[in-house]
Amino acid sequence: MWPDGICRVTNTRYTKTIQYQDINYQLSQNEDKTAIFEAWCDFLNYFDSSVQFQLSFVNLSASQETFARSISIPPCGDEFDGIRAEYAGMLQNQLARGNNGLIKTKYLTFGIEADNLRAAKPRLERIETDLLNNFKRLGVVAAPLNGFERLHVMHDILRMDEQEPFRFSWDWLAPSGLSTKDFIAPSSFEFKTGRQFRMGKKLGAVSFVQILAPELNDRMLADFLDMESSVLVNLHVQSVDQVNAIKTVKRKITDLDKSKIEEQKKAVRAGYDMDIIPSDLATYGAEAKKLLQDLQSRNERMFLLTFLILNTADTPRQLDNNIFQTSSIAQKYNCALTRLDFQQEEGLMSSLPLGLNQIEIQRGLTTSSVAIFVPFTTQELFQNGSEALYYGINALSNNLIMVDRKLLKNPNGLILGTPGSGKSFSAKREITNAFLICSKDDIIICDPEGEYTPLVERLHGQVIKLSPTGKGYDGSPCYINPMDLNLDYSDDDNPLSLKSDFILSLCELIVGGKDGLAPVEKTIIDRCVRIVYRDYLNDPKPENMPLLEDLYNALRAQDEKEAQYIATALEIYVTGSLNVFNHHTNVDVNSRIVCYDIKELGKQLKKIGMLVVQDQVWNRVTINRAAHKTTRYYLDEFHLLLKEEQTASYSVEIWKRYRKWGGIPTGITQNVKDLLSSREVENIFENSDFIYMLNQAAGDRQILAKQLNISPHQLSYVTHSGEGEGLLFYGNTILPFIDHFPKDTELYRVMTTKPQEVASA
């Protein structure tokens, strides 16, 4: 083995390995399945007779400690340790439901004959580049393994009983006099009996699959890989030279024709009809001619396939059970599983991803017959990062879904679903998880329905209740100043330009009118904004922060009649009955978790309130950016923001701008149609790499199917689905999920929005 990943397996054979990820084949609609199948056929046809390749599917048991570490939430010695333990317990229970105890990996190993490494290397690298491009066309993520990584894979296979970390360095070889084999070999091998072997403390047995079925099924390989025990499935494939393949088939047809003539002669001599010949002869003749036609005119090649399965276990009885289960799957598809007799050592070596086949049991198959063993089933989303959050379990495999939105190119997100499908609950679960795990992240919620207060109070956050009377939950004054300005408000040196844009949006919302503000009115407002912020920018003290009243007075001081018109429109919000936003901010907007409850603002103030909250959040995002902190922003009833042009355009700006500033906005809505109300608002969809889609109404399903290219089969997961069930879109991955949160917990009681449960809590 060399550091670049090239391995010499015989004196003249050199191999390399590529690891590739899964794609959603089983979840795809039939047209997509056909497209993947045809693309896989083209992939196989790339290999000529000089390149032998091996498809390896390695399902190994991982220690529960490995997964437990991934989902653990260590106590911090504060008042939240109780809910940390509760949430961690829920994750442990969900982990036990799935088969996350298995780590599933897929490899393609290819090899060529060459006189030496210098001759082999350029050709192997050229083949590797071509294969990576072919994987890319399939939409499959793939990467070549270097020497260390290949040794690591074989270490995990050969020492699966130890589950110890792989320790190796190329620098250790020369001083120690050891070879790479010494670092991957198990403590012992034992091949005493002809039908099984012992490898360290593990028992194993290699069998080969006899393909007897006249027709093969694309589920067969998937069923082998769905077994809940450690198993290694290997397909060694050797392409046959096309000219030789055609010659061989023609020779076989000639032999069959010769036999047919002999049978006809016998018939004539015996005095019966010469068309009556053995049925097998007629069948073989027709099949051979069809095979010749496929090879000559249907882009089919001939391959020799060796199909090996390695089962392992801790005890002989368990091994027999695993082999019996494997054999049952083979029989289900009219194939036979046969144990290798006195070839177990060769079988084990052939089961390692080395590209070396020592088992001379081969079956000739055409391209489409080999391709029916489609190496794709369903994707998994289980990230080991310290900030990966829980989003349910994979409905196809029952495995945990743990992902970190920060790893996406665009972490902006949407939570979509009909009333009662679990939208707000899903948002609260993510908020809680982020609060408990992502210790540096700040969380801000825009809450138009007053649903988040119990959770925020349990997390000791700040609930800012905005109402026309200006009174908070405890009756004390509660004010937010829309004129608040942070000096880091903009990318450039002039934060006032961006603040002026917000105030223009605010005035446009207040003044109203079908056509919005006229150019003259915009100019006047911009002029006044610069006047009222002059003192604060010269001396940025809190008491110098302007109020809406200062803008009103500046407008009154202007000569233009348009200024008087705007000032009059502002009057009700300054000296009138809706003057709740004409005060200095007097609440703590810097708490780690802040909820803006705007339920009681009323129809006149709610739109303005939502816009003011947006601006307050932007202030917080700019402060956090300087402190290298992430700001998670949740906008419930998001459709309310999209109904007005001003708040909609400001929301679109959030979706475009937040990523660069360390913000992660999440819109929560039941009205998908509002998300597509204009081309501008449609950008929110295009700038969201995370979509948590729960049950959808019929009309919305069709819109989403078209917008997100969802297949009918995928759509079934959001059709009349239960609470907490649906589809997760994470980057290019689509997974069906189920999230049933345990109801007998404190967290459930503070997160539920069901009236009867809220009342009882």
Located regions from the model:
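Extended, folded cores of ATP/NTP-driven motor/assembly subunits in large transport
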Residues: 1-378
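P-loop NTPase motor domains
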Residues: 23, 30-49, 60, 223-225, ...
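Hydrophobic anchor at the beta1->P-loop junction of P-loop NTPases
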Residues: 415
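Conserved lysine of the Walker
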Residues: 423
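Hydrophobic positions on the alpha1 helix immediately C-terminal to the Walker A/P-loop
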Residues: 426
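Short beta-strand-centered segment that lines the nucleotide-binding/catalytic pocket of NTP-utilizing
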Residues: 439-453, 467-468
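Structural recognition of the conserved hydrophobic beta-strand(s) that form the central parallel beta-sheet
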Residues: 443-446, 595, 634, 658, ...
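Conserved AAA+ ATPase "SRH/arginine-finger" region at the nucleotide-binding site
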Residues: 465-472, 690-699
